[in-house]
Amino acid sequence: MSQFLADLRAKNPLVHCITNYVAMNISANVVLAAGASPAMIHTPEETADFAKIVGALTVNIGTLSPSWVKGMKLAAEAANEAAVPWVFDPVAHFATPYRAQAAQELLALNPTILRGNASEIMGLGGQASEAKGVDATDPVEAAEAGAMMLAKKYGSVVVITGETDFVTDGSRVARVSGGSEIMPMITALGCSLTCLMGGFAAIAPPMEAAATALALFAEAGVQAEKQATGPGSFQPHFLDALHNTTPETLEKAGRITWQ
């Protein structure tokens, strides 16, 4: 799996990140630090054209408007037509009817990778959840059956992020451990993971791309925590750790368990 990190840095794929206002800066910096190249384009007048020429597309519904939803759908449709992999992050899709409808319309376009927290994945799978905002209130284990179902239904690799991340294509399963308790204290850090996952999806098969992105993220979190004194100092140390983690270090960390 560590070879994919070397490939990412050698190929420096262009990642089309349609993400929310809160996440744009940190997402672009995370993608750059890891070794890929971000483009933060969301207007519907150009999303379809751009999605056809990139290595991967990522779509995050954190901040929505009719224009943004149109741009997201056009980009996803264009990516499918051009065989460009795309990652969907259905942020708090259960919060409002408008958000829920947008999420279902995008999910129907069969994302290559679907990434969410346990509450988001449970909701998309039709399971009851206690979540009320963007943060998960359900354990990863509660969403695993729903993730398997969604993977089979939409032909997607489904990722549940949490204390131990869960990845499935409907038959295979991988779990990724690591990270830091400080990570949830930094706004939009999870959103940036979606963009990073797009970088790996541009150069690796979807299941392996998702697992490698999670492993790099987790390892960087572990390393950043060793030097940080709180959320403020954690963020720059995290970016440095993404940049400085080598394929050999990632391999030695052994953060991925395949089942």
Language model region names:
Residues 68-117:
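Glycine/small-residue-rich loop that forms an oxyanion/phosphate-binding "nest" at active or ligand-binding sites
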Residues 219-259:
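Charged C-terminal helix
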